Amino acid sequence: FHSYLQKHSIPLESVMSKVWNKKIFKHIQENVDQASKDLADERGPCPDAADYGYNERFSNKTAIAPTASISIICGGASPGVEPIAANSYTHKTLSGSFNVRNRYLIKLLEKHGKNTEEVWSGITTNQGSVSHLDFLTDLEKNVFKTAFELDQKWIIELSGDRTPYISQAQSINLFVAADIHKRELHKIHFDAWKKGLKSLYY
């Protein structure tokens, strides 16, 4: 989801991200609902649904799983609905360590004529952030904010907005400082509960 927003220059902390969030997950849910009905017509409803008079093939249809490993295999896409933790980081494997760079940021840096090792070294040193790059506009910096730079209320807000379109649950991670005040931490959890989230991770 975050990769999609970055590709289209949409900050995660924006009304447009809310619009696309609802549009995407409503589209998925509507199509899954239709597929369940179509398969029920073709092969019969599942026993649980049939017992209650519903013509549905599936009783549970959608969930958002943690997809950290899959996102790396898919060329560095953002993991599920989770924001990207860093625009540049070192990925360690059994084969060795290698630098992973945000592919949409690469294109933006090329546009500015700044896709250099020096710039990438600065991004890596700055915990994957682009906030120190004075040649980027405020919009561009907002588009490429890392998970730790984002106001976590937006993660809760977006998660709550997509909840009606998910039949099971979402894997939602929050990115907070180790020294976060307990009052703020309680507020985040309370806001998540008020928005109808079933769970939070880490």
Language-model features, listed with the residues they occupy:
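Short, compositionally biased low-complexity segments
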Residues: 1-13, 81, 130-136
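Internal maturation/activation junctions in enzymes
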Residues: 5-67, 138-141
